[in-house]
Amino acid sequence: MSSYAWSAVQDAPVEVLFPGIRARPLWRGPGGAQAIVLEIDPGSCWQGIDVHDPGPEEVFVVAGTFNDGIRDYPAGSFIHAPAGSSHVPQSVTGCTLFVFYPEG
C-alpha cells in the first residue's frame, strides 16, 4: 500500500482559472496524467473554448449541474471527451466536477 497516493480536496491548493472557476489539483502522474476537482460557481463560464489536447478528458459530475455549452449534465453524470474535442464549461446552478486527464 505504500505506493498509493492520496489527497484531500479541502487540503488541495486552489488555482483560480477564471472568475468563479477553481481547480484543486489532487494528483499528477507520469506522462502528465492528472486528477483535479473543478468547482464552478453559479452563473460562471469558461473564458474561451476548452480544447482537449493532447489527450482525452474524463469528467464525473459530483454535485450540481454542469453544462458543456450544449447540454446539461446533472450530478452522477460521466462524460468522456475524446482528444481534439472541445467545449465551453459552465454552470447556471454551480457544480463540482472530478476531472481526469489520462494523457495530460
Predicted regions and their residues:
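Ligand-binding loop in jelly-roll beta-barrel domains
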Residues: 19-21, 83-104
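A short, N-terminal "cap"/entry segment at the start of jelly-roll beta-barrel domains
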Residues: 1-36
